[in-house]
Amino acid sequence: PIYDRMQEDLLNNQVKVIHSDETTLVVSRKDEENKDRKKSYVYVYTNSFYDKKRIRIYDFQESRSIDKTAKWLKNYQGVIVCDNYNGYNSLKKQNENIKLQKCWAHVRRKYTDIVKNLKPKEKNNSKAYKILQAIQQLFNLESSYKRKNLLADERVERRRNEVPSIKEKLEKLVFESNPIKGSALYTAIEYTKECWNDLFTFIDN
C-alpha cells in the first residue's frame, strides 16, 4: 500500500518532472540443480528538486526491459529525465504527453573521463575540454538559480535568455568535430549527437 501510494503521488498531475535511472546488480539464486548468478536491474524514480515533497521509488527488475515502466507511466503527462537508453525513446513514442530530457550528467561524464586523462599541456587545446567547459556553464546556471531560489517562471525566463548562446556554442563544437573513429572523443561526440534533440527540453520547463 505504501509503494502504491508513493507511485500515485509521483504520477500526480502536479509532478511535472520525473528522473529515471537504473543500475545493475548480480543476484544469486538457487534453482533445482545449482546456484546461478544473474545480472538484474534496479530502477529508481524520483521527482524534481523543486517539488515540496520528495519521492524516491526503487523498482527491482530481472531485465533492463522498460515494459513494466511503460505500463505505469502510460498516463503520465510531463518530462522524464533519463539517459539515452532506447527504451525511453519508445516511451515517448507510446505516450505523446511525455517529453524527454536527456541527462546532461551522463553526457558530461563522457568528456570528464577524457579530460582527466589528458596532460596539462594537452587539456586547454583539446576539443573535449572545450565541450566540457560549455556543458559546465549550463550546470553553473542551474546552480545559480537554486541559490537564488528563483520561482519556476523566473527560471524559465532566465533559461530562455541565457541558454541559447551556450547551446549554439555546443552545437558548433559537437557537430563540426571530426574525431578519429573509435576514439573516446568519437564515442562522446556520437552519444551527444544521439541525445541532441532531447538535451534542451529544460529551457521551457
Task: For every predicted segment, state its role.
Residues 1-205:
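Catalytic center-proximal scaffold of phosphoryl-transfer enzymes
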